């Protein structure tokens, strides 16, 4: 079986060596072929030299696809997804650190390689020096309970840097265009929930490095800073519109393959703004299209 890690880099000279060392130190099954596929998004620091140095030292493991300015982590990962030829595909951020058993424990969690599956784990939250921080998972966006398709349409509860997918899922997802996509990992999660299975490994298998340059982070959903940012009416209205656009775009890509039940869940959500205000609120409440905290639910009911 070919195990492939997709590593997207951009100006990551401060952390990428440590991450690459953790990937190369992964415990492996002797029967597996192990590879790391890297795409650099036009870094202007020492990142290109660092990753080329690792490729020269580990030519049978590390491949760098031709450099191209992607402009975002999402676009960079989409390039990697299109270039991937792995049987099991892991997604990796340049600034995290993987525990040695990350790959093996994730592989063991898959139930099937014939139907679409996505496996994700918990994570340790760490500072810039990888010192583990005390964190209550119930207060973070890493925490989830009772995931449903309705909940996943309004909020991604799964950290993209912890996920792996099988070939069946990636082949099903891949296309030339992804209308309305908010993030590549959210899209993968939606596909897994709609057409396959999401599997949770309850062990903390990576250290998620919390620092000022994180593009998306493990947010404290009950902090005053986070709450105040989600009371901004203009931002909330735009965010809600983006959620509806993503659901509609996803449905336009795969709706003809959905079960009638899942198709109705998508249609019920992305057509919300075609209803009057009271009907929108009732549809969200009765349908279970609800975010994870009271503040966020109130915001979405007002501005969706």
Model-identified regions with their sequence ranges:
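C-terminal subregions of glycosyltransferases and related glycan-biosynthesis enzymes
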Residues: 181, 209-304
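Nucleotide-sugar donor-binding/catalytic module of glycosyltransferases
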Residues: 1-220
